[in-house]
UniProtKB/Swiss-Prot annotation:
This is L-arabinose isomerase. The lineage of its organism: Bacteria, Pseudomonadati, Pseudomonadota, Gammaproteobacteria, Enterobacterales. Homohexamer. GO terms for cellular component: cytosol. The gene is araA. HAMAP family: Arabinose_Isome.
Amino acid sequence: MTIFDNYEVWFVIGSQHLYGAETLRQVTQHAEHVVNALNTEAKLPCKLVLKPLGTSPDEITAICRDANYDDRCAGLVVWLHTFSPAKMWINGLSILNKPLLQFHTQFNAALPWDSIDMDFMNLNQTAHGGREFGFIGARMRQQHAVVTGHWQDKEAHTRIGAWMRQAVSKQDTRQLKVCRFGDNMREVAVTDGDKVAAQIKFGFSVNTWAVGDLVQVVNSIGDGDINALIDEYESSYTLTPATQIHGDKRQNVREAARIELGMKRFLEQGGFHAFTTTFEDLHGLKQLPGLAVQRLMQQGYGFAGEGDWKTAALLRIMKVMSTGLQGGTSFMEDYTYHFEKGNDLVLGSHMLEVCPSIAVEEKLILDVQHLGIGGKEDPARLIFNTQTGPAIVASLIDLGDRYRLLVNCIDTVKTPHSLPKLPVANALWKAQPDLPTASEAWILAGGAHHTVFSHALDLNDMRQFAEIHDIEIAVIDNDTRLPAFKDALRWNEVYYGLKR
């Protein structure tokens, strides 16, 4: 059972009565065949549901209205099987508030060269039916995606599936509640922002709860529940001598388990799926939540440190998008550099809170060590290195008049040396196209020091995210050149200024 089982995508066929009942019968037959095949063979993340043909303005408007009010409907896939005059779609599209994709396909893959006639031509008119639909989308400034390809083509399946992930994540985001335990880290700018504007743009709500409210729940956790969770730790991780049953830090592990159980209970009771903490506001907690946060992220919760609610929300959104995909997604921070000509590297980490979903496939180490920040008892944490390979880091920032998403494509590499004195999870990567260009572009665009790191998602996923939410995106990859990047930022300033 995944979040995608809670949603469905409606498959809508556009046509008209001009061609007669027999043509519409064939259109319906083709649609049923295609939808059944896609549901069976395409490995789509959620189910396609075929709706009645859209052959008149009233029918199309009714479908769009019903889609808006059906909580299970994540979006619409439209196939213009025959020509479907686009003025019929204006009223429906003008009220539609769900994501929209045009599947530019046709029932047959190859033309029947010897038998093709005008009946065949009238039945299979995606080539210009899709263009008519595209015009009205452009004319109405209607954001929608387009996937071209035969319905049996695996590349088309992959692209539709990726769009479905965006559609579902958008619906989930509209219900997302972010809990901030305490406020922002004092005097930090980028983690702040306009929470009302964020709710208007994305749909998620952000509110603050006193740490004392959390502490009350944490203190209510009984020893039996703690013992059961400790048993899970024992079976899942390699515990250092200090954290084992007779170790001098065993009580710290028990306290970490108490915090994890209390946090999870608090989040579940409040319906929260993302949260923040800050080391400056821990009154009543015996240690900074480290292990608890790591394990909650692995269960799908969004998180960011120092009150950074935008990154916490983005992490939750990206975890929904990547559900079921290979690779993990985590809160991350660009921490320090390794400057070496031709081999510049970024070491990413945080004080404690890196998600185990990105870890190498080996038993993780559970340890308790001193943390100088926060002024509390030594916290428990999982220590690991990160899987290697292509990845991205993404940052969502508030520019006052709009949101900007920054994405840097990176290549995660193996740590060349052991890190015996670094008791935190970490990731090591090469930034594309190189560290000087990537860091300068990131800084010029205002990117945060907190990011979401993902092996599971790629640049195309984040481009779709920006499009479906109608926000700016700034991309840093192997094609980035600083003069052109600066120009793009200037052009975006003008474009979004005119768009307000």
